[in-house]
Amino acid sequence: MVRESIPKEGENIKIQSYKHDGKIHRVWSETTILKGTDHVVIGGNDHTLVTESDGRTWITREPAIVYFHSEYWFNVICMFREDGIYYYCNLSSPFVCDEEALKYIDYDLDIKVYPNGKYHLLDEDEYEQHMNQMNYPHDIDIILRRNVDILQQWIEQKKGPFAPDFIKVWKDRYKKIRQY
């Protein structure tokens, strides 16, 4: 059943990541919604329980702001560490929401961005392996490659979640909501 409305500010939701074959990949138990629109969901979490597909669990180490967009095939996790802000970008389907969680399909490719602005494309071998195993359609491959380019442009241009004011605004908003 589809959620009738977008997640509301202050609401706590789960985030569920799937693989192309429909199997659950990873679940974040709780993320606080900072902004929810038809196109963008921004959330915050800290020391959140994460459950892997094999049942293993772990807890995130630092506060993070998460960014999802309904028109782009990626999502971004901004992690606040002692030595600066790190970004972990997942190439994924656009998000959908229902009563259970915010959901997306993880397509293996990732970009890690360091505090100095340098970045690396990760997991290309895993992507090739899963593309063959799960029969990713050629159209999906084209879309994902195009979104890698878009994401790299955003990183280089400090656009969207990579903009310095984005970090300040949403980190402050998360702190404020957590105080209530």
From Swiss-Prot:
Its EC number is 3.6.1.15, 3.6.1.6. Its cofactor is Mg(2+). Keywords: Hydrolase, Magnesium, Metal-binding. SUPFAM superfamilies: FomD-like. It holds the Pfam family DUF402. The active site is at 26 (proton donor). Mg(2+) 2 binds at residues 108, 110, 123, 126. It is an enzyme of class 3 (hydrolase). It catalyses: a ribonucleoside 5'-triphosphate + H2O = a ribonucleoside 5'-diphosphate + phosphate + H(+); a ribonucleoside 5'-diphosphate + H2O = a ribonucleoside 5'-phosphate + phosphate + H(+). Gene3D superfamilies: FomD-like (2.40.380.10). GO terms for molecular function: magnesium ion binding; nucleoside diphosphate phosphatase activity; ribonucleoside triphosphate phosphatase activity. Mg(2+) 1 binds at residues 90, 106, 110. NCBIfam families: PRK13662.1. Has nucleoside phosphatase activity towards nucleoside triphosphates and nucleoside diphosphates. PANTHER family: PTHR39159, UPF0374 PROTEIN YGAC. Belongs to the Ntdp family. This is Nucleoside triphosphate/diphosphate phosphatase. It comes from Staphylococcus aureus (strain MRSA252). The lineage of its organism: Bacteria, Bacillati, Bacillota, Bacilli, Bacillales.
